[in-house]
Amino acid sequence: MYKQLEILALSVLILISIVIKAVSDENIKDQFPNSFLYSKPIEFIPNIWSAIGATGPPTYENTGHNNNLSFITSDEGVVVINAGASSSLAKALHDEIKKIINKPVILVINENGQGHAMLGNSYWIDQGVPILAHEDAIKEFEDNGPQILNRMIGYNRDKADGTRLALPTISFTDKYVVNLGNLVIEALYLGPAHSPGDISVW
């Protein structure tokens, strides 16, 4: 009886480890090969879109798209959450947004001070779009931006072309509200989290 339970428990553990390996495999092939985006933006609920990034570290193959690049569409325009890891990745996201809606991007929100959230800022600023981030995220990017940029250039090589450091143009401490007529977006700082200046957007 005990032997059978041991075999069953071992079988369950092996099955769980196989499932975990499949779900968390860092070598999942690029899901959107004709774009610098790792995956194509999907509308999860009405007006809320996200291009889900790779689950592994940033590489040349995933163009540094290892976070979620999201956007909210409205009659007033589009709000983007996360600028992308480079100018080329930001442009790839913008190209997809233009296929979905004929409205301008009116704001980009950096969810924190990490490279994949902020290094695409220069592209958006060149388009005339204001960039919002928490004050701690801006300080993180001010202090460590050159190293963050150099790391990205190291793995992204030619895909880093045109990317330069560009700080957010709007900062906030606790809460920032974006009123889009029939839609209100709140950027909230809820305290220390994954990295300096991490915020929630809802």
Where in the sequence are the language-model features?
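Bacterial N-terminal signal peptides
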Residues: A9-S17
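Bacterial Sec-dependent signal peptides at the C-terminal "C-region" and cleavage site
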Residues: I16-N34
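Bacterial N-terminal signal peptides that target proteins for export
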Residues: M1-A9
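Beta-strand-turn-beta hairpins that frame and shape the catalytic cleft
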Residues: E43-I48, D75-V78, V177-E186
